[in-house]
Structures are given as C-alpha cells and as structure tokens.
Amino acid sequence: MVDDKEKNMKCLTFFLMLPETVKNRSKKGSKKANSSGGGGGGGSVGSGSSKLPPVCYEIITLKTKKKKKMAADIFPRKKPANSSSTTVQQQHQHNLCNNNLIPAPNWQGLYPTIRERNAVMFNNDLMADVHFVVGPPGGTQRLPGHKYVLAVGSSVFHAMFYGELAEDKDEIRIPDVEPAAFLAMLKYIYCDEIDLAADTVLATLYAAKKYIVPHLARACVNFLETSLSAKNACVLLSQSCLFEEPDLTQRCWEVIDAQAELALKSEGFCDIDFQTLESILRRETLNAKEIVVFEAALNWAEVECQRQDLALSIENKRKVLGKALYLIRIPTMALDDFANGAAQSGVLTLNETNDIFLWYTASKKPELQFVSKARKGLVPQRCHRFQSCAYRSNQWRYRGRCDSIQFAVDKRVFIAGFGLYGSSCGSAEYSAKIELKRQGVVLGQNLSKYFSDGSSNTFPVWFEYPVQIEPDTFYTASVVLDGNELSYFGQEGMTEVQCGKVTVQFQCSSDSTNGTGVQGGQIPELIFYA
C-alpha cells in the first residue's frame, strides 16, 4: 500500500504540472480503472502486476526514453482534418495582424515548434511587458514587445532591459525609426523571417544598425545591391556612407561611373547631401559629358534652395553650391556646350565667363579656379568571341535580316555597345540597329551608321546609354545591318570567354534569322564596362 501511495503522489504532482485538458483525460482514465476493479484496487497492487493510471504510465514511459527529440519530431505538422481547425488558425492570424489577444485558450497546441510558438508573440499584446511608441510625432504607432525575446535578438535591447543601466519603463518612445521598419525588425527577431520592401529597406537598415541586428542589416544591404540601378545609385551612395557599408558604396560607384549621365539626370541625384555631391563632382572616372554634370549640379542647387526655404534665384543657387561649383570641369566642355549652356546660365560671373572663353581661344591661357583637366572616364573592355574571321564571295550579305546571339556574365557589367564587322570589298557604310533584350523585354536599342575601311577589324556601335547587365541571366544581343557590300564574318566561335575578371558565356538565339550563331557569324564583340 505504501508503494501505491507513492505512485499516487507522483501522479498528483504531474497533474499539477499538466494543462487542464490532460487533467480531464486523467479523471476519465481513473474512473474506468475503478469501475473495472470494483473496490479491490489494493489486491491488484499486491499481486505484483499493478497498473498505473493512464497518465502516469505515459509520463513514466516518456521519461525512460533516452533519445531526445525536437517538438517537430514528436508532433509533426499535419493538414487539418476538418475546416474548424483551419478556421482557428486563420482567426489567429487575423488577430496577429490586428494586434489583438489570442482567443483560443490552448493556442500552444496549434504550433508544434518553438519557432512557431515564438512567432505567435510577434506584434501581440498577449504577455507583452513593454510597449514602443514608434515614429515621428503625428505618425506614431504603439507596438507591443516581450523583453526576453527582444533581448535574445539584440544586444541593445538586452542592455536596455537587463543591463546595469536598465530602466524599468513600460513604454519606450522611438521617434527616429519608421513603424514599418521597426515591425520588419521585430518580425525578424520573433519569427526569424526577413520581409523587405523597396520603400522601407533603407529605414529597416537604419533600425537594424541602431539595434545591432547584423544578419538583418546584411540582408538589407544585399537587397539594396540587387535592386541597385542608375535611378537610385546616388541616393544609395549617400546612405551607404552614412551606414558605413563599404561594399555597397563600391557597388554604387560602379553604377554611377558606368551610367553617369543616367545617374546625374535621375531624381535621386537631387536628394543627396552636399558631401555626396562633392564626392560625385570630384569623381575622375565619371563617364559623362561635362555639360551634363553642370546641368545636374544646377538641378541639385534648385532643390536645395527649396529645402532651405530660399528663393529660386541665380544668387541662391550659386550660394548653396558654394565651392562645389569649381569641381565642375567647365573648361573641358565642348565650346558649343559652354557657349550655349554654362555661359548663359547666369551662375558664372562675368569675369569667369570671359576667362573661360579666353581659355578656349587664346594662346596664353588665363588661370582658372575651375579644374581644367578632363576626366579620365572608364576604359571599355571588349569581349571577342571568335578566334578567326573570313570572307567568301557569297557571304556575308545583309538584307535587313537579324543577326542575334545570347550571352550571360558572372558579375554585373554595363554593355556600352557591340563591335561589328565591316565590308570585305573595300570602304563601305552600314546602317545598324542594335538591340539588347532580357526575356523579350527591350533594355536598350540604338539606330546609327558606321563606316568600315575594308579591313577585318571590328567597328564599335554604341548604345545611347550603357545597359546594366545582371549576372547569371541570359540576354539577347541583336543587330540588323543594312548595306550593299559583303562583309567579314567570324569563325571558330567560343561558348565561354574569360575577359579580365568577367566570364562570358554564349549560346544561340532563336531571334537570329541571318545565320549568326555560336560558331560563326556577326556580333563578334561585346563592349562593356566592369
């Protein structure tokens, strides 16, 4: 009987530790035992083949297992047997989105893993022991938090809640972080999920940096690098310097250098700070005409006047530009660009205008405050895909048909144009329409003419602006040539070419209707910046 009492005490102890539903189950089990044994339960114990109540048996059995299993192994996720359980989970998700309490009393049973149960607490008032008022005045949002979870995910939160200087506040104001960005950070901390959007990624990066969540910050930088283009490169350059992200800064410079005119004409250029403006104007490798640089600086000055609540006058534009004006290499402009543009802008003083005109025309040139040395720009690289070229009496003829080839690179480059063969019958002029597509979408095209001298050399034909090419994706390069003379054509084509640090792969294109393929034909060269 002593043994019976000890076992009963163990069972009662476990009953106190188990949820209410298990208690009910145990009560049913004990009733069945009593009904089967009548009043002689003690005799069965004494026989040596005693049976424990069902709950106790299950507990002891689990304790004797040596191999530990994760919750997901013990309770594998299954599809709901009926629509009611699905409705419960949908309602639960609805409550999460609306920052409400969980209505289900036993919600823990719906989520088999600790990760899923932890995620339930995201943006949930249930058991919240701190609240954040996030956002600037007039645009705040009150968000719940759980100190333990936050401290595990961020050393800043750990110091805030459990450090030596921890403050016991129920509500914390964070005016310098956008609510959407703060929620994105909380979602990562609670759910181990990264949810980024183009319009909030910079704010999320700021939050991740502020609260030292390095993996989220790295994901933000990767997102920005992937979405980097001439339209946003200048803004991202400014932000990358602010966040001290040198890799992102380098990627921004690569885009700005190669697609300088597009970057300078973008709306984002006008949103940069003065320090970034100076950095761009100093840039030796900008691939842009100086008149474009000058016009971009004036556009920036106009927006800066608005930011400073200054009248849009010539004097104020020059005032906000300050010494940055002299970083524009006005003496290196074409004379027509200067005479019809900068000289008539009103930004230059009369003496400056006269001195620059003398710089163009006089043998004894005056001293100028402006930099008079032209920018170096970028040197284009050429990827030649044929090992030899030839001509025959009946090839290569053009009658408005398309020559096309597909290519892919292993790092981001900027296609500036194509190198094309010329006439094999002496000097001749060709009309060329070049085009670059990705999955049927035209990324760049240009119609121009080029003159060939009868040699087997290639002759460059340029796009209006370099086209950004992403790695590991096939693009289609096409050209339609119109000319009366037969031309040279390539032979012994290569499927892969190493050009500096860039590997280029080639494959045939279904757009080609004039015979060009990997082994031979036209488009012998890709001209690009890397």
Swiss-Prot record:
Region (Disordered): 23-48
Full protein name: BTB/POZ domain-containing protein 3
Pfam family, one: PHR
Protein's UniProt keywords contain Ribonucleoprotein: no
Record function comment: Acts as a key regulator of dendritic field orientation during development of sensory cortex. Also directs dendrites toward active axon terminals when ectopically expressed.
Domain BACK: 243-308
Ranges where the BTB domain occurs: 128-198
InterPro entries, alphabetized: BACK, BTB/POZ_dom, PHR, PHR_sf, SKP1/BTB/POZ_sf
Tissue: In the somatosensory cortex, specifically expressed in spiny stellate neurons during barrel formation. Also expressed in the olfactory bulb, piriform cortex and hippocampus.
UniProt-listed CDD domains: BACK_BTBD3, BTB_POZ_BTBD3
SMART domains: BACK, BTB
Keywords: Cytoplasm, Neurogenesis, Nucleus
Highest taxon above the source species: Eukaryota
